[in-house]
Amino acid sequence: VNTTSYQNLTNPQTIYVRLEDLNNDCVSIGEFNLIVSLPPVILQPNEIIALEECDDEIADETTVFDLTVKDDEITLGNVDWEVIYYETEQDALEGTNAIENPESYTNTAVAGNAANPQTLYVAVVNLEGCVAYTTLTIRVLPNPTPSTDAQDIELCDYNNPGDQIEVFDITINEAYIINGELGVSAA
């Protein structure tokens, strides 16, 4: 039997060990089990919805993400598994340089790849220590760029003279404020 490269025949499999004292020929028998555990079943990249956040006040395509909001989706709701995020695939495979604070991660350019969108690498570890890998795309969405210098709207006080209260149609500046952007609305 090759003890450094033994392939189990069943799962689990009991292995018996015989220890023999070479000086006095005394023998002791022990046993242990070989158990093969499956890696966790997790969502794969094409099944995971990208994590998107609006750009912060500065339009620089970087913002802070709480990556942990995706833990439940990735693990299919298994709260006993550990979810670890990495910036590179190599780090994930080696289990090094995990993102220290996944609750407050700012997207960044890594290894020549753009910061937006950014692909993160995810390792999920089950209770047996088996690991499964996937990816998570994070994307910073641009903020609308409205025109902020719309003209004042003036009306004469005809409705109830002297109370200085009138009914305005404030949508008359809407097209100017939207500034031709598609997919936005003014509220």
Please describe what each predicted stretch is.
Residues 1-187:
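Extracellular low-complexity Ser/Thr/Asn/Gly-rich intrinsically disordered segments
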